[in-house]
């Protein structure tokens, strides 16, 4: 059995890691770390986990017996705590943005904090699970993608790689539930502020914008910029990303649907919807699925892609476990076969 540790154990990302890893046949949760809740029973923070008798612990590097440690922490914590563990030879899967952006200047411009050391950035593997191979011996630090980038990149990757789009025309209109903001209190997620309300935020300066652009640029082999506008909606969890992109070749809905279906034929967690149907966030709730609906406006030759995920599963903890499976050469669906919770 692989001994796993979870850092940031009192946050939403950690809750999902605990829930999902309980059913993983090759994993045991050896340690749950939280610097603010050391020695407290897990069930005191999460009453729905009454059946788990573990206590929060303080993270240590010396004598740490984990094979893999998941970090579900803010980026500054990851930047400080992860390098010594990697140096010790422990596999680390980081759910923060600390190691996603390879250009330190761009990171500092968007995150408003000092970037990780360049050596650490160079060694971190940014892993969208659907097309990343990981070497158990060579890969020590996996940078798990963000939630908005996951939903967006899964939809755009086939079109960019097939070179059928006008790269200057990409518009991403994305909606997210409030769990994406974490458990920390802020005025904009108070019930009276959020309920029956819809708001755009971080226009032009969201941390996920350079992450999306960085990866699209790698696929395209040239610099790619996007217009990305996120919105906060009054629901607990879920992301719906509507993407508009001009096609440089003539396509119909049918021909683009065929391309997308073929591209993801062997990827169990990407479900391309039938023509004329478009996914909703509830239809992937609690699951590791990404559902994508496709339409081509033939008059303007514009592709409209609707991509939905659960931000806490496919957008965070589920993809992290998927990366664990790839790292250890397990079946990719191991521990992740849960159907969506509906209604």
Curated annotation (Swiss-Prot):
Pathway: Amino-acid biosynthesis; L-arginine biosynthesis; N(2)-acetyl-L-ornithine from L-glutamate: step 3/4. GO terms for cellular component: cytoplasm. Keywords: Amino-acid biosynthesis, Arginine biosynthesis, Cytoplasm, NADP, Oxidoreductase. Its EC number is 1.2.1.38. NCBIfam families: argC. Catalyzes the NADPH-dependent reduction of N-acetyl-5-glutamyl phosphate to yield N-acetyl-L-glutamate 5-semialdehyde. Transmembrane segments: none annotated. Belongs to the NAGSA dehydrogenase family. Type 1 subfamily. The active site is at residue 147. This is N-acetyl-gamma-glutamyl-phosphate reductase. It catalyses: N-acetyl-L-glutamate 5-semialdehyde + phosphate + NADP(+) = N-acetyl-L-glutamyl 5-phosphate + NADPH + H(+). One of its GO terms (biological process) is L-arginine biosynthetic process. It holds the Pfam family Semialdhyde_dh. InterPro entries: AGPR_AS, AGPR_type-1, NAD(P)-bd_dom_sf, NAGSA_dehydrogenase, Semialdehyde_DH_NAD-bd. PANTHER family: N-ACETYL-GAMMA-GLUTAMYL-PHOSPHATE REDUCTASE, CHLOROPLASTIC-RELATED (PTHR32338:SF10), N-ACETYL-GAMMA-GLUTAMYL-PHOSPHATE REDUCTASE, CHLOROPLASTIC-RELATED-RELATED (PTHR32338). GO terms for molecular function: N-acetyl-gamma-glutamyl-phosphate reductase activity; NAD binding; NADP+ binding. It is found in: Cytoplasm. It comes from Staphylococcus aureus (strain MRSA252).
């Amino acid at each position: 059995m692989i001994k796993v540790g979870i850092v940031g154990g009192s946050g939403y990302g950690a809750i999902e890691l605990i829930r999902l890893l309980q059913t993983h046949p090759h994993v045991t949760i050896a340690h749950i770390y939280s610097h603010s809740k050391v020695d407290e029973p897990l069930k005191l923070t999460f009453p729905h986990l009454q059946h788990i008798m573990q206590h929060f612990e303080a993270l240590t590097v010396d004598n740490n017996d984990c094979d893999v440690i998941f970090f579900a922490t803010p980026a500054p914590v990851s930047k400080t705590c992860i390098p010594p563990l990697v140096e010790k030879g422990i596999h680390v899967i980081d759910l923060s943005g600390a190691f996603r952006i390879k250009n330190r200047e761009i990171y500092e411009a968007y995150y408003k904090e000092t970037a990780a050391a360049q050596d650490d950035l160079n060694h971190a593997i940014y892993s969208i699970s659907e097309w990343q191979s990981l070497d158990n011996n060579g890969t020590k630090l996996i940078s798990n993608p963000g939630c908005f980038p996951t939903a967006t990149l899964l939809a755009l990757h086939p079109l960019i790689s097939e070179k059928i789009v006008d790269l200057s025309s990409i518009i991403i209109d994305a909606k997210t539930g409030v769990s994406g903001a974490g458990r920390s209190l802020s005025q904009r997620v108070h019930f009276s502020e959020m309920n029956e309300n819809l708001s755009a935020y971080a226009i032009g300066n969201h941390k996920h914008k350079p992450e999306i652009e960085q990866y699209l640029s790698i696929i395209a082999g040239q610099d790619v910029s996007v217009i990305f506008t996120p919105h906060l909606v009054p629901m607990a969890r879920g992301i719906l990303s509507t993407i508009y992109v001009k096609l440089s070749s003539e396509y119909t809905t049918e021909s683009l649907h065929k391309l997308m279906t073929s591209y993801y034929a062997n990827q169990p967690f990407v479900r391309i919807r039938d023509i004329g149907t478009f996914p909703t966030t509830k239809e992937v709730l609690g699951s590791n699925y990404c559902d994508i609906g496709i339409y081509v406006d033939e008059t303007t030759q514009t592709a409209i892609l609707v991509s939905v995920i659960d931000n806490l599963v496919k957008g965070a903890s589920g993809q992290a476990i998927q990366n664990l499976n790839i790292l250890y050469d397990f079946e990719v669906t191991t521990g992740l076969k849960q159907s969506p919770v509906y209604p």
